[in-house]
Amino acid sequence: RAYFRKCLALKHICDYKFYMEIATIILAAGMGTRMNSALPKPLHRIGGRPMLAWSLDAAKAAAASRVITVLPKDSDSIISWLGDQESCIQDIPKGTGHAVKAAKSQLADFHGVALIMFADTPLVTAKTLATLAAAVADGSDIAVLGFEANDPTGYGKLVIDENQCLKKIVEHTDATKTERRITLVNGGVMAVRCPLLFDLLDEVK
């Protein structure tokens, strides 16, 4: 398995449906108010392409058998751009967990790895997604992308135990003084075993 995962991550050999199927949930339901633009945030261009296009391509290159984009109400322009690609609507903006849960009915019978990523992260690669998915396929229930920040101010902190297992993610505003010094921070992408994902989301208040 270690060799398989190495090949998967380094060479983008991502066709491993025989191992564990992947579905990717792309979160594009944010209002994008800070953009101060009539154009929906996911359709703003980076490198000549909409940000959402980069996320979709990365998900497909990581061998996702399904890619579901979560959209806000009144997102006709994004739906038109997506064409026949799968999507769902988050009727009321109630945060990230609620947005992921919007895809629950479409993944009701799915037993595999759910990759969760944001539409406005165009630099996340298929290699990164495949590595996260492989960690879950290898036996973990959840794998979270983290990175070392020179200045961790404002980022969610990844609190790990002595075995390098994730204990919790703490937002900067909720962190203790000690936790605020943690430089390993949340990269905003995770892989979760299904149907465990939605069992956990059902417990979120």
Language-model regions: role of each:
Residues 76, 124-204:
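Conserved core of the sugar-phosphate nucleotidyltransferase
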Residues 15-19, 49-134:
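Conserved N-terminal catalytic core of the sugar/cofactor nucleotidyltransferase
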Residues 39-45, 204-205:
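Short glycine-enriched, charge-decorated loop/helix-capping segments at active-site entrances
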Residues 28, 71, 118, 146-147:
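Short beta-strand/turn micro-motifs composed of small residues
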Residues 19-37:
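N-terminal nucleotide-binding beta1-loop-alpha1 segment
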